[in-house]
């Protein structure tokens, strides 16, 4: 390789993993969770706010926001109920509960660090088995509670306590702008 007279620039070293990752470069796994429609709309608004303003550290996408909210919530549960240690992983063939809600829930797809996804499943199983965490009976309910708490804090800090609004404009009949060309 030809030299241009300048010394090579070393690649940056990322020594601190992002919130939710056990280590830099950890593998991720696809995950889907169902959350209430109104929470999904707040999530969309928060992601838009974060990407437009840059005021929410480490949040550039829906996956980032879900990952950070889940990490904070699960870490708090581990501190409160398991001396800061991760909860045991549920059996590999364990399946979550079916839907037990009456309002419209929306499925969201994200990619989570493998270790965080396992911690979410372990915490959800603990919460369901012990009834020590009110309202958390499944991974979906855990993610819902984590997002609601995290978004409420963001709304207090960045939006004068008002809920974030879904940035997609609604047309008559509930259609979105994009749907009129589909």
Regions found by a protein language model. Give the residues of each.
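A detector of short terminal or domain-flanking linear segments
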Residues: 1-182
């Amino acid at each position: 390789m030809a030299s241009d007279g300048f010394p090579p620039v070393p690649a940056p070293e990322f020594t601190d993993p992002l919130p939710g990752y056990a280590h830099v470069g950890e593998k991720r796994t696809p995950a889907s969770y169902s959350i209430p429609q109104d929470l999904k709309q707040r999530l969309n608004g928060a992601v838009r706010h974060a990407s437009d303003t840059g005021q929410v550290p480490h949040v550039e996408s829906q996956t980032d926001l879900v990952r950070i909210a889940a990490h904070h919530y699960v870490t708090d549960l581990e501190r409160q109920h398991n001396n800061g240690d991760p909860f045991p992983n549920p059996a590999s063939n364990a399946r979550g509960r079916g839907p037990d809600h009456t309002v419209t829930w929306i499925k969201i797809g994200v990619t989570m660090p493998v270790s965080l996804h396992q911690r979410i499943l372990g915490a959800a199983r603990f919460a369901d088995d012990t009834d020590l965490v009110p309202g958390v009976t499944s991974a979906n309910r855990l993610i819902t509670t984590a997002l609601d708490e995290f978004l409420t804090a963001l709304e207090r800090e960045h939006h004068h306590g008002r809920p974030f609004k879904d940035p997609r404009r609604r047309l008559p009949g509930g259609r979105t702008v994009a749907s009129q060309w589909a």
